From Swiss-Prot:
Homodimer or homotetramer. GO terms for molecular function: spermidine synthase activity. Spermidine binds at residues 63, 87, 158-161. It comes from Prochlorococcus marinus (strain MIT 9215). The lineage of its organism: Bacteria, Bacillati, Cyanobacteriota, Cyanophyceae, Synechococcales. This is Polyamine aminopropyltransferase. It catalyses: S-adenosyl 3-(methylsulfanyl)propylamine + putrescine = S-methyl-5'-thioadenosine + spermidine + H(+).
């Protein structure tokens, strides 16, 4: 758009996090305002409706933590559903597993996919061309409702923060529908917000999943571009989860292609729940 640099800020409860750089894209889609900026430190960074979604600098903290605890521990992983994920990072991590036969990516905003394919090739890369991937421009809630029982082995909810058009992705009814379309041993993996900046939402997600599924586990790590810098991912299943039970040979192969995730990192991240969150969950 212009070679002039400017500050773009995300505001949250009296605080702000800003990046200075050249604006590559600024437009409003059917659903949200989309801004893509190029920053000296973070590289290209994507903002949706005033919230930073991803950047080239730190996106692997997010995508590797969302995907690999589930896919490296589950034996059957033929059919995968990604809700959201229009930047391509979750797809990129999924296609590393040869056992996967089909990946359905359901993204409501086609503009996010188009922009990511053109300007964020460093994230999705060749994963967009993987023959196992089918892209559906659709509402994730509606997609889940029309899916037959016991169809997916893993569901990834790679959504933005709760908003007017994404609130239902955090609802009891939606999680129950996800449980219905998962196989009996399937895993739901979702970003579950920050225990600091979005504490109440975070606790609500954890309590809801605990009530709906037989078992759930939450891990914490860093995503510097997000409010407070600490983020979480929660994994839930109708069976007893054992995310530390891994196929050693497969884990070592996947670790070689990761920048952040490895088994030691994962095991530590599952032990990082702040005590104030523990108390809230026990109350």
């Amino acid at each position: 758009m212009t070679n002039i640099t400017t500050w773009i800020d995300e505001y949250h409860k009296g605080s702000r996090f800003g990046l200075n750089g050249k604006i590559l894209i600024k437009k409003t889609s059917k659903y949200q305002e989309i801004i893509l900026i190029e920053n000296e430190y973070y590289g290209k960074a994507l903002m949706l409706d005033g919230c930073w979604m991803t950047s080239l600098k730190d996106e692997k903290y997010y995508h590797e933590c969302l995907v690999h605890p589930a896919l490296s521990s589950i034996e059957e992983k033929s059919n995968i559903l990604i809700i959201g994920g229009g930047d391509g990072g979750t797809v990129r991590e999924c296609v590393k597993y040869s056992q996967i036969s089909k990946i359905d990516l359901v993204e409501i905003d086609e503009e996010v996919i188009k922009i990511s394919k053109k300007f964020l090739k460093e994230i999705g890369g060749e994963a967009w061309n993987d023959k196992r991937l089918e892209i559906h421009v659709d509402d994730g809630v509606k997609w889940v409702k029309k899916t037959r029982d016991n169809f997916y082995d893993v569901i990834f909810i790679d959504s933005s923060d709760p908003s007017e058009f994404s609130n239902l992705l955090f609802s009891d009814s939606f999680y129950k529908e996800c449980k219905r379309i998962l196989t009996p041993s399937g895993i739901l993996a979702t970003q579950s917000e920050s225990p600091e900046s979005f504490k109440n939402i975070h606790i609500n997600i954890l309590k809801t999943l605990k009530n709906i599924f037989k078992s759930s586990e939450t891990m914490y790590s860093f995503v510097p571009i997000y409010p407070s810098g600490i983020w979480s991912w929660t994994f839930a299943s109708s069976k007893n989860l054992n995310l530390s039970k891994q196929n050693y040979d497969e884990v070592k192969k996947i670790e070689k292609g990761c920048e952040i995730w490895n088994l030691n990192f994962q095991n530590a991240a599952f032990k990082m729940m702040p005590n104030k969150i523990v108390k809230e969950l026990d109350s």
